[in-house]
UniProtKB/Swiss-Prot annotation:
Protein's organism: Bacillus thuringiensis subsp. kenyae
Biological classification of the source: Bacteria, Bacillati, Bacillota, Bacilli, Bacillales
Protein name: Pesticidal crystal protein Cry1Ea
This protein's UniProt keywords: Sporulation, Toxin, Virulence
Any Pfam family matching the protein: Cry1Ac_D5
Gene Ontology molecular function, alphabetical: signaling receptor binding; toxin activity
UniProt GO BP: sporulation resulting in formation of a cellular spore; symbiont-mediated killing of host cell
Transmembrane helix as UniProt keyword: no
Spans annotated as Disordered: 1094-1124
Family: Belongs to the delta endotoxin family.
Amino acid sequence: MEIVNNQNQCVPYNCLNNPENEILDIERSNSTVATNIALEISRLLASATPIGGILLGLFDAIWGSIGPSQWDLFLEQIELLIDQKIEEFARNQAISRLEGISSLYGIYTEAFREWEADPTNPALKEEMRTQFNDMNSILVTAIPLFSVQNYQVPFLSVYVQAANLHLSVLRDVSVFGQAWGFDIATINSRYNDLTRLIPIYTDYAVRWYNTGLDRLPRTGGLRNWARFNQFRRELTISVLDIISFFRNYDSRLYPIPTSSQLTREVYTDPVINITDYRVGPSFENIENSAIRSPHLMDFLNNLTIDTDLIRGVHYWAGHRVTSHFTGSSQVITTPQYGITANAEPRRTIAPSTFPGLNLFYRTLSNPFFRRSENITPTLGINVVQGVGFIQPNNAEVLYRSRGTVDSLNELPIDGENSLVGYSHRLSHVTLTRSLYNTNITSLPTFVWTHHSATNTNTINPDIITQIPLVKGFRLGGGTSVIKGPGFTGGDILRRNTIGEFVSLQVNINSPITQRYRLRFRYASSRDARITVAIGGQIRVDMTLEKTMEIGESLTSRTFSYTNFSNPFSFRANPDIIRIAEELPIRGGELYIDKIELILADATFEEEYDLERAQKAVNALFTSTNQLGLKTDVTDYHIDQVSNLVECLSDEFCLDEKRELSEKVKHAKRLSDERNLLQDPNFRGINRQPDRGWRGSTDITIQGGDDVFKENYVTLPGTFDECYPTYLYQKIDESKLKAYTRYELRGYIEDSQDLEIYLIRYNAKHETVNVPGTGSLWPLSAQSPIGKCGEPNRCAPHLEWNPNLDCSCRDGEKCAHHSHHFSLDIDVGCTDLNEDLGVWVIFKIKTQDGYARLGNLEFLEENPLLGEALARVKRAEKKWRDKCEKLEWETNIVYKEAKESVDALFVNSQYDRLQADTNIAMIHAADKRVHSIREAYLPELSVIPGVNAAIFEELEGRIFTAFSLYDARNVIKNGDFNNGLSCWNVKGHVDVEEQNNHRSVLVVPEWEAEVSQEVRVCPGRGYILRVTAYKEGYGEGCVTIHEIEDNTDELKFSNCVEEEVYPNNTVTCNNYTATQEEHEGTYTSRNRGYDEAYESNSSVHASVYEEKSYTDRRRENPCESNRGYGDYTPLPAGYVTKELEYFPETDKVWIEIGETEGTFIVDSVELLLMEE
C-alpha cells in the first residue's frame, strides 16, 4: 500500500473516537517552519559539503528564503513552549536585525558567486573584502541583541542561526582571505576570532537551552511532559544539533570537507489524549519509562507487538524490540515493554532488508480515547489502536490500522522525495502503561535518530570522517556511556580506569592499501595514553593531555583534539578498531566524543605539518613579539619543535619554514640565557678543574639521536657502591638570587636507580626509574638513518606521553612519573665569601643501574613568599646553628688527630719517622684523621666538604708516613695484601682475608715453608718485627739467617708456661699479662689497636637532622674507605715480637714455618735502624 508524501493528505481517522482530542496542534504548526529550516541546515552541515557550498547553502536554506513572518514563527516557537511573551519592541527589533542580516548576506553571496566565476579580477576581490567587512560588522553588532536580558531563551533559536552564520563567514575569510587580497595578519586575526567565538557561542547555547528546560514544570501529568518533551525535541533540532557542527568551522582543524553524524535521539509527542488530568501517568513515571538511558547507538531490526482487548477496544499493550549495534550482526532483544497479551496474534513489524529501505522514516498512528465518567462507572481508555510504519519508498508495514497522527508533523522531510529527503529514522519504541482508578493508559513513545547516523562506519578517502564512539559495537568493562554535554551531537564515553574503551567496525570506501591518520576529540581531567589497535595487528599510540580539572563541568572549552596519528593502513575491509587505555593512571576521568580519520594525503600532510609547526612555535613564547619564553617550555621541548620545523617541506612552504626556524633559534638562545648550568650541551667532562661538569671516567658523551637533538650523557652501572658512577656541577653563589626558588629539570630517555641531588643547606633527593620505550621506529617505518648516517627525525615514529603518572602501592618499586624530571630547591640569604652555591649531582651506585639524559637546565623559578619564605629562613638558621656545632666538634677532633699524626714523625718537616713507629700506629693515626667529619659530601665523596682542607692536610702526612715506612721495610709484601707475591712457597699455604678485612698468611702444615731473599747493608742494624698468632700445639717460627751462619728466630706458641727466647723482648707469660693489662693486642710502643681506634660516636653525631624542609642527609659509609681508613684492629690472640739483627753480608733469608698445628702471620717487617 502506498502512502502519499504530502503530510496534509494523510488518511483521516474517526474523530468521534476522541471528540476532545488536542495534540498541541497550534504549537506544532508554529514550530514546523523552524524545525524544517533547522533540519535542512543540519543536513547541510552534516554532509561533506565544500566550503563554498555551505556559504550558498545557508543562503538558500534560511537567509535568502524567509521573510519577517517566518522569523516571527521562529520566535513564536519557543514563546509558546515556555509560555513567555516577547515584548513587541524587542520582537520588532530582533526581526529588523534578522532582515538586515538577510539582506546583506544576499549581497555577500552574490558577490561571492561573481568572484568565484572570475577569481583573479581585482575589482571583484576588492568587492569581496568590502562585503566581508560589512557582513562581519553587522553580525558582531547584531548577535548581542539576540542575548538581551530576560529574553535569552525565547531568542535562542535566532541567536544560534546568527552565530552559525557569523562562524561561517569567519571561516570564509580564513580560507579565501588570501585570494581576496587580505594580508596574513588580518587573516590570522579573523581566524583567532573564529576559534575564540566557537566555544563562546557553543557554551552560551547549551547554558540557555538547559535554563529553558529547567524552567518548565516537571510535575503533573501527560500534558506537562508533552510540553517538556516538545521543547527538548524542537530545541535539540534547532539549537543543539546546529551548535554540534560549530567546531567544524575551524578551517585549520578541518581544512577539507568533513562528514559528521548526529547520534542523539529525539522523541515524538504522545499520540494519545493529553488534556484530562485524571487520565495517564505522572510526569516522573513517563520520563523514567519513555526516555532511554545513555547507550551505544543501535538500529531497529523489528518490533514484536502484543495486542490486548478491553471493553471491546483492541490496543497496543506491550512489545519487544530487537536491534543491532553499528557493524554488528549480533541481535539485541529488550525486555518486554508493557504487558504480554494475546487478544490477537502477535505482530512483527520489520522494515525491508533492501539497502536504503531498511528503516522506517514515518509513523501514522491511530489513537483511541474514552473519558471515564464519575457518575457512571465507565472505564477511561487512552490507547493506540494501530500504527502504519512507512519506509522511504512509502511502502507500509501495518500494525492493525493506520491513523492520521503523523510523525512528519514533528520531523518533516526535505522536499517531496522521501527516499533522500527523510530526516529521521525510527530506532526504538518505549511504552508507558498506567492504571489509575478506572482509567487505563498505554502510551507507546517513538524514538528517532538523525539520518546522518548511518548503520555503518564508512571511511571515505577524500574527506575527514567523524565517527562518534557510541557507534561502537562493544564496550570495555569499566567504560560507561553518559549523556552528552549538549554540543557533541549525542552521548559520549567515559572511563576512569585502565583497560579497553570500545571496539568499532569500520568500512573503508577506498583501496585497502591507502594510508590513514586518526585523532580523538576528548576531554580529560588527567593525562592519558591511548592505544589504538587496527585489525589486531597495527598499533597506534597516542597521547591525550589533561584539558580540565577534576570535578569541572564539561564545556566546549574543556574538549580538545589530539594531533593526527602516524599514518597506518587497514588490513581488511571491514576492519576492527579497538581503543584502550593501557598505562597506569591516578585519579580523574577521560571522556571521548569521537575519532576522526583522514587519508594521509601528501598535500594535506604538508598543510597539517605547517599548521602544527606554527602552533608549536608560537606556543613557546609568552607573547606574539617573542620577548620571553614561557616558564614551562623546556629545552627539550624547544629541540622537538625545532625538529618539526626542520621537517617542513622546502617545496611547499620554504618562506614559512625560514621564518619559523629563526623564531625557534631565538627561543633556543633565550633558553640558554636563563640556564645557570655551565656547558649544558656536554661539550666535555672534566675539561676544566674549577667549572663545568665533573664526572667519573666511565661516563660517555654521545651525539644527538632520534630522542635527543643535542649531546646527551650515558651513565653506566657500577660494581661497587663505594665507587659510584657520578656527574656533578656546582652553581656558583654569584649566579643565585636571595630568597628564590630554583628548578633543575631535564629529559631522561631511560634510567634505572638514577639518583638526583640538589644540595645547599640540605639535600633534595629523588631516585628515578624511567622505563625505556624500546625502538621509537615501528617496523613498517622507513629507516631512521639519513643519507649521511644522521638520525632521520622526520621519519614516522611511535610517541610516548612525557607526563603520565604512575600508580604504585607504598613499598613497591615504581617507574618515575615522567621522562621529564624536575627538582626544585630554595635559596635563602646569599654570601659570595661563603660561596655555598648549589651542587647538582647525578649518581648511580648499583650494578644494574643506568641512565641516558640530556637537555639539563637549572633556572630561576620564582621569588619565595609567605610560608615558603619562612620555611627557608628556618632551614637556613638550623643549618648555621649546626655548622657552628660542627666547627666546635671539628676543632677537638682535629687536635687529637694532628697529635697522633705528629707523633709518627721526628720533626715538623715530616720527612723521617720515629724509630719505633710501626704499621699499627700509622693505621691508628689514620683512623683518627678519618674521624674528621664533613671532609667530603656524604652524597658523593669526591666533592670536598667544609673540612676538606684540614682533612687533606693530615691525610697527606699519613700517606707520607706510609711511604717512609714502606721505604725502610726491606721485606716486600710483608703484609700479604698482594697474596704470595715476592714469597717462595714449599708445600701448601694460603693467604686468607679475615672478617676484619686483613690479609693473613696461613701455614696449616708442618712441612710447609714460606721464604724470601732480602738484600741488606752489611754492618748496619735491623729490627725484625712479626705479628702472628699460633693455633694448637707446637710452635710457629720466623727465622732470619745468612748463607752460612748468623741465624736468629722468633717463636710463637699457644703456651701457658713461661718460655724464654734468645734476644726476644717478650715471653708468653709476659704477653698474656700485657694483653690483659691493655685489653687487647700489644705492640712495642703503641697501645692496643682497639684503644687506638676507639671513638665516641655520640660525640660526632650527624649535624644534619632537618626533616620538615628537605630530606635528611646521612653519613656516607664509603667515606671512611678512602685511603687506609678501612684498616681494622687485630683480633685478640695476635702478638707482636721483634729482635735486632746485624747482617755480615748483603743478603739474608726470611723463612716462616711451624712444627704442628696452624701458624697465622699478619705481617713481617725488617726495618733499618737509624744511624
